[in-house]
């Protein structure tokens, strides 16, 4: 086997001196991510910062010739060890490739490099009245390249779908350094194999995306947001399922369980009831109140206590800000406990009440704090077990409970990961799922 520490060939690739580093601190930073627990990865021998497709191609070709492993790296915000090397080699940090190359309003398209932070896309589109809808909650800190690699999704997936539905074309560098163009800028095509979608969600295992053409859509003329309070978690999940199966045109529908509500109140100084809630947002070109009323009527049949629609945009923005930071708030909730990496199972809508009920039954049976919330409109739930970090047995049992939730989701016809990806954290579930 080749020596993964022999990266002397980098000096012959024409890279600038600041485009690669063997600094111990830099290498250590690229041996971890935001969520990996007890990482079994190996720090890369070198970190390379390409600034163009040509740089990526040169590095991959040379690494391939020398049998040196390369692990693509974006913002490092993944939760499952996706960008962490397992055999050392080179960490290919694409964050310097962060340009918006073109905005074509007439085509409803934008061309971007992979290192661009997601929220910067929508900021640039403001003046055109357009937006890119399928952003994850981490859009302010994660890159579009990482989102494409994970086939990311977020709160608006229930209406707008996942990233792969909005990627029109990709420029990809393969392991041998060859550059391929996949997809097209046409709205539709029946030409040949859909290789573009094979790359989306492949987590950097098949190639490195160096340019993406994304589809856009006009910003909705009408937006209404609010919250609904229910008599029980089961009532809330049943109401969500009923609304979705009835075809309610909702852009966001988020479950917040009582523990998550309590954490939100303490962290953000809000006065939300410590009760099961659903956060909602509707997008429409016209007649938005009709859809709000339809949703309210369905909720009324499923244990609705109160449904309040925000009168001012700032009021709802405050709730969405709290929801976006809820995972971090959970981590700060108890000084004596720490959270395990958040899970993100997704199940068919008809089983949503079942999986949330199962999570709550585990919490009750084992006297555990297991907050549960998530993008309920597409069957997704986020959860974590709070454990005593100083008690190895407690940590191990917490991980066992996390695994049980995944096993149950798979039994229900769901997936181990709705949006965080496989990485190293969920590899053991691949065989059972596929």
Locate predicted features:
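N-terminal flexible segment immediately upstream of the FAD-binding catalytic core
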Residues: 1-61, 77-108, 258-268, 315-342, ...
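N-terminal accessory segments
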Residues: 1-36, 66-68, 298-318, 411-416, ...
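C-terminal substrate-recognition/cap domain of FAD-linked oxidoreductases
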Residues: 22-32, 217-218, 224, 229-232, ...
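Short, ordered loop/turn segments at secondary-structure junctions
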Residues: 74-77, 137, 255-258, 421
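Short beta-alpha connecting loops at secondary-structure transitions
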Residues: 98, 105-108, 226, 390-393, ...
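FAD-binding subdomain of flavoenzyme oxidoreductases
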Residues: 99-254
């Amino acid at each position: 086997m080749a020596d993964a520490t022999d990266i002397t060939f980098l000096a012959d690739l024409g890279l600038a001196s600041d485009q690669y580093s063997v600094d111990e601190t830099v290498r250590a930073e690229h041996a971890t991510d935001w969520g990996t627990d007890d990482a079994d990865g190996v720090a890369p021998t070198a970190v390379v910062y390409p600034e163009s497709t040509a740089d990526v191609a040169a590095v991959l070709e040379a690494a391939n010739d020398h049998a040196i492993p390369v692990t693509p790296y974006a913002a490092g915000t993944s939760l499952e060890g996706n960008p962490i090397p397992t055999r050392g080699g080179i960490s290919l940090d694409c964050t310097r490739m962060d340009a918006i190359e073109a905005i074509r309003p007439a085509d409803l398209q934008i061309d971007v490099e992979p290192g661009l932070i997601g929220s910067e896309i929508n900021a640039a589109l403001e003046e055109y009245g357009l937006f890119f809808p399928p952003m994850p909650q981490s859009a302010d800190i994660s890159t579009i390249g990482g989102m494409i690699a994970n086939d990311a999704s977020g709160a608006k997936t229930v209406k707008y779908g996942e990233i792969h539905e909005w990627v029109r074309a990709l420029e990809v560098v393969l392991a041998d350094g060859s550059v391929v163009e996949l997809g097209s800028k046409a709205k539709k095509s029946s030409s040949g194999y859909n290789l573009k979608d094979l790359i989306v969600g492949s987590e950097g295992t098949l190639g490195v995306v160096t340019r993406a053409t994304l589809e856009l859509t006009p910003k909705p003329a009408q937006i209404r947001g609010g919250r609904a309070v229910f008599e029980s978690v089961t009532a809330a999940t049943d109401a969500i399922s009923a609304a979705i199966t009835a075809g309610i045109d909702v852009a966001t529908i988020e479950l917040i369980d009582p523990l998550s509500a309590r954490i939100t109140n303490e962290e953000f100084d809000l006065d939300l009831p410590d009760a099961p809630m659903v956060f909602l947002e509707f997008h429409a070109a016209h007649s938005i109140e009709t859809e709000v009323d339809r949703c309210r009527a369905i909720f009324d049949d499923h244990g609705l206590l109160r449904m309040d629609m925000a009168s001012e945009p700032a009021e709802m923005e405050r709730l969405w800000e709290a929801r976006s930071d809820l995972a971090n708030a959970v981590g700060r909730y108890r000084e004596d406990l720490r959270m395990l990496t958040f899970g993100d199972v997704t199940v068919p809508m008809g089983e949503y009440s079942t999986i949330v009920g199962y999570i709550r039954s585990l919490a009750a049976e084992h006297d555990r704090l297991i907050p549960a919330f998530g993008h309920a409109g597409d069957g997704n739930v986020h959860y974590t077990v709070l454990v005593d970090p100083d008690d190895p047995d407690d940590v191990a049992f917490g991980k066992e409970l996390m695994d049980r939730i995944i096993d149950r989701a798979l039994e229900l016809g769901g997936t181990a990961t709705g949006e965080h990806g496989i990485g190293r954290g969920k590899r053991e579930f691949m065989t059972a799922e596929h």
